């Protein structure tokens, strides 16, 4: 008969612990008799007094009360609202410490999930200046004391904290959004109230082209009616000549989803333009576009290096999105085929190929695991397969398709080390060897880490 394990700690108990590790969301991990306790702001190696605030069967949560010893990597967060906002998780850790923690995270999952203990994991490629890197700001609008507030939701709530600037956001976007808030307030625009489903302005979004300097402004409203629209647009366009596009998106639904279905251009163009390396991209209000183009170039350069192209290869890019990796590869490949399930993304991909006069990139809509076997039957043989899946990783059917097609190389671009390690294990069992793993820091001060991996087919 099994005996039920009783947790070794109780709620409201004060205990001394040593933090051993960080979780994937940046909390410190301490253990009591092997039982894990997660504590926000704890860092590995630190000795601390904590208070137990929630006890579950297999783990508990604690609050950091007092540090007995401090990590040499601990620092004061530079953002005044760091502890209220959920946007960053690692500002209390030096940037060097962040990069080391991310490298360890990748190594750990390679061993624990992938069983790949001997694979070279390189040091994380970080940023020279890990601030003001985000090119897209999406802020909720609210009302307080008769005025508009714009900022972010307090962690775990829908309470908007007013914020003049964000340290990881492009300053151009911050400046624009604060001025737009003042202009809208002056012209009597009401904020959306989600409890009453009243009011006009739900969110404001700004997109900034880091290379071109062009900005797009998006008003997301509950109703198609935007009072004093003409005067608002004139004032914004006069004050901000770099704003090349002002767009309205209407979302009448009671939902947490930000965008509605209807988008209208109010001023200028439907697109702004930006470059990653030598490739030019047209970016619409709804386009997926990497939020840190500087590090995206680092990631794509490494992808291109791993693909080892000399101009004679056929490459398939699964989960190709707006064609950003496909077009990078098309600079060196004979032919690139990109596949993506979102039709609008494929329209963007075709537009971007035309924009760059690239005739050797072809795009198809559908599930990669359906479209790629169809191409295979039509005689498309990939020398190199590139995959860049969402966080859930590759569909099992796609992994089986890769194993059946036997491309010489697989380059796997990942935003989730855990699903990456799981998928590498499947490909290893199917005849591939993982040669090297290169983590890239796309989102400094957060726990996210991207990786690009080179796999080669082992001929038996």
Curated annotation (Swiss-Prot):
Q: Which CDD domains match?
A: AdoMet_MTases
Annotated binding of S-adenosyl-L-methionine, by residue? 290, 319, 340, 388
Q: Where is the TRAM domain?
A: 8-66
Q: Which InterPro entries match?
A: MeTrfase_TrmA_AS, MeTrfase_TrmA_CS, NA-bd_OB-fold, SAM-dependent_MTases_sf, TRAM_dom, TRM5-TYW2-like_MTfase, U5_MeTrfase_fam
Q: Which UniProt keywords apply?
A: 4Fe-4S, Iron, Iron-sulfur, Metal-binding, Methyltransferase, S-adenosyl-L-methionine, Transferase
GO molecular function ontology, one term from the record: 4 iron, 4 sulfur cluster binding
- What are the positions of the active site? 415 (nucleophile)
Q: Which top-level group of life is the source organism from?
A: Bacteria
Query: Where would one find coiled-coil regions in this protein?
Result: none
Family annotation (Pfam families): TRAM (PF01938), TRM5-TYW2_MTfase (PF02475), tRNA_U5-meth_tr (PF05958)
Q: SUPFAM superfamilies per the record?
A: Nucleic acid-binding proteins, S-adenosyl-L-methionine-dependent methyltransferases
Binding locations of [4Fe-4S] cluster: 79, 85, 88, 166
The family database entries (NCBIfam families) matched by this protein are listed as: rumA
Family assignment from sequence similarity: Belongs to the class I-like SAM-binding methyltransferase superfamily. RNA M5U methyltransferase family.
**Name of this chain's protein:** Uncharacterized RNA methyltransferase BCE_0363
């Amino acid at each position: 008969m099994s005996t039920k394990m009783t947790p070794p700690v109780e709620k409201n108990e004060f205990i001394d612990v040593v933090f051993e590790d960080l979780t994937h969301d940046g909390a410190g991990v301490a253990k009591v008799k092997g039982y894990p306790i997660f504590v926000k702001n704890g860092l590995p190696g630190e000795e601390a007094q904590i208070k137990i605030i929630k006890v579950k069967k297999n783990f508990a949560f604690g609050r950091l009360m007092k540090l007995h010893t401090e990590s040499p990597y601990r620092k004061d967060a530079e953002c005044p609202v760091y502890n209220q906002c959920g946007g960053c998780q690692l500002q209390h850790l030096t940037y060097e410490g962040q990069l080391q923690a991310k490298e360890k995270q990748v190594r750990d999952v390679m061993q624990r999930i992938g069983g790949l203990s001997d694979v070279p994991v390189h040091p994380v490629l970080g940023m020279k200046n890990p601030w003001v890197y985000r090119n897209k700001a999406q802020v909720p609008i609210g009302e307080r004391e008769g005025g508009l507030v714009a900022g972010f939701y307090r962690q775990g709530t829908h309470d908007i904290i007013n914020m003049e600037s964000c340290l990881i956001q492009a300053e151009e976007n911050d400046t624009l959004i604060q001025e737009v808030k003042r202009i809208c307030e002056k012209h009597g625009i009401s904020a959306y109230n989600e409890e009453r489903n009243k009011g006009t302005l739900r969110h404001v979004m700004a997109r900034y082209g880091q290379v071109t300097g062009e900005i797009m402004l998006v008003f997301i409203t509950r109703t198609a009616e935007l009072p004093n629209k003409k005067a608002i647009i004139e004032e914004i366009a006069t004050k901000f000549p770099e704003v090349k596009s002002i767009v309205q998106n209407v979302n009448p639904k009671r939902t947490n989803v930000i965008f509605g279905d209807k988008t209208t251009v109010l001023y200028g163009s439907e697109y702004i333009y930006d470059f990653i390396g030598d490739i030019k991209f047209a970016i619409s209000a709804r386009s997926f576009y990497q939020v840190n183009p500087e590090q995206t170039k680092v990631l794509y350069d490494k992808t291109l290096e791993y693909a080892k192209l000399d101009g004679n290869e056929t490459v398939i890019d699964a989960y190709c999105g707006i064609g950003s990796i496909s077009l990078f590869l098309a600079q060196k490949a004979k032919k690139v085929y990109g596949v993506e399930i979102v039709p609008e993304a494929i329209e963007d991909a075709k537009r971007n190929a035309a924009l760059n006069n690239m005739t050797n990139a072809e795009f198809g809509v559908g599930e990669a695991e359906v479209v790629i076997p169809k191409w295979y039957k039509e005689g498309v043989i990939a020398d190199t397969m590139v995959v860049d899946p969402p966080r859930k990783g590759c569909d099992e059917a796609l992994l089986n398709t890769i194993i059946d097609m036997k491309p010489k190389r697989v380059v796997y671009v990942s935003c989730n080390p855990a699903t990456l390690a799981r998928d590498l294990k499947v490909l290893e069992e199917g005849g591939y060897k993982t040669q090297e793993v290169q983590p890239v820091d796309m989102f400094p001060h957060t726990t996210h880490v991207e990786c690009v991996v080179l796999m080669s087919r082992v001929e038996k």
